[in-house]
Amino acid sequence: MNIFNNNLHETDKEINEIIKHEKLRQSSVIELIASENFVSPAVLEAQGALLTNKYAEGYPSKRFYNGCEEVDKAENLAIERVKKLFNCKYANVQPHSGSQANQAVYLALLQPGDTVLGMSLDSGGHLTHGAAPNMSGKWFNAVSYSVNKETYLIDYDEIERLADLHKPKLLIAGFSAYPRNIDFAKFREIVDKVGAYFMADIAHIAGLVATGEHQSPIPYAHAVTSTTHKTLRGPRGGLILSNDEEIGHKINSALFPGLQGGPLMHIIAAKAVAFLENLQPEYKSYIQQVISNAKALASSLQERGYDILTGGTDNHIVLVDLRKDGITGKLAANSLDRAGITCNKNAIPFDETSPFITSGIRLGTPACTTRGFKEKDFVLVGHMVADILDGLKNNEDNSALEQQVLNEVTKLIELFPFYG
């Protein structure tokens, strides 16, 4: 076998078929998973480039390997572009994921056993914010704050009370399932009162922050972490930002050699391409459309009688509370999947069901907005979702309705282009 002459379909027919089938799946469903998006062909091309061959431990101009001249240029471009995008002084584009970006901040600023204060999982927080099964919950004394039991909004008074009581070394703002804006300035006030560090995890809302559609944490947080996919529409990966260059030096050392070895230079190049796309005027229009579409989706579900957590959304996330409907999140997500609508089961604040079952579903608009969906299309999507949920309330067998909605999905999705 001559590896330099064979294409994928010649070398590995099984993987080639899997990719073909996945392309068909992605092209034919309404994608409502809030953490997913579609990258541009340019980003795909960059992350499939031969930069994957290059080892580049260290940082630009300070590598442990020779032959890094070109990958240095790529990483410097990514750094400068993302600093411009977020108007900050420091950026590290090497984290392999958002989780590893968070871990690097912990390694830079904390010692094992230090107290961290983050949002609980059922309130919309992330595993890496102190959840018991995660490294952040095992290595540190993790304390969680919740949302208000009546409004389901972040309770800043409760956060301040917990901070005064537990004196955390690090306060974390950020979420994986919270549909409203965050007051980063208020978090900083609390941090300053107790002498803690402040980390903002903007993995979900990075695109909103970059375009000015959400308050930026850069002036307030000691460190800001994010993924580079989701609303940034780049390759899967992470990044760390700050205006404190001294903390930036600590984070650099924590990430390499503390946490990671060689960076993924093909992914960093793809990040640079995505950041260039994010700097274009049309990207702001895209983010505005993402938000408008989410509001339209939420309103259409409310019109059909479904409870939307917090009564609506300020971002790209719509959380549907199914408790009064007698439907589990798992049942709803699986039925929607069979109908060609992909989402995920999701815990609702103070959820008493198993995290593998849940009492709600999480819906998001970034992916379908990338394909060109507008408000009127998401109104239709909302009614499709409601039709499936209505069927689950009234019938044990939802298969006929699932097929009917699948036919509607197929007609709608064919109107919007996908990769050639």
UniProtKB/Swiss-Prot annotation:
Protein name, per record: Serine hydroxymethyltransferase
The keyword ATP-binding is annotated on this UniProt entry: no
Top-level taxon: Bacteria
Sequence positions bearing N6-(pyridoxal phosphate)lysine: 230
Organism from which the protein derives: Rickettsia rickettsii (strain Sheila Smith)
Keyword Transmembrane helix: no
Gene: glyA
Coiled coil regions, renumbered to chain: none
Cellular localisation: Cytoplasm
Subunit structure: Homodimer.
Reaction equations catalysed: (6R)-5,10-methylene-5,6,7,8-tetrahydrofolate + glycine + H2O = (6S)-5,6,7,8-tetrahydrofolate + L-serine
Residues the UniProt record annotates as site (Plays an important role in substrate specificity): 229
InterPro entries per record: PyrdxlP-dep_Trfase (IPR015424), PyrdxlP-dep_Trfase_major (IPR015421), PyrdxlP-dep_Trfase_small (IPR015422), Ser_HO-MeTrfase (IPR001085), Ser_HO-MeTrfase-like (IPR049943), Ser_HO-MeTrfase_PLP_BS (IPR019798), SHMT-like_dom (IPR039429)
Keywords, sorted A to Z: Amino-acid biosynthesis, Cytoplasm, One-carbon metabolism, Pyridoxal phosphate, Transferase
Cellular compartments per GO CC: cytosol
Family statement drawn from the similarity comment of this UniProt entry: Belongs to the SHMT family.
Principal place of residence: cytoplasm
Any GO BP: glycine biosynthetic process from serine
Span of the signal peptide: none
Pfam family, one: SHMT
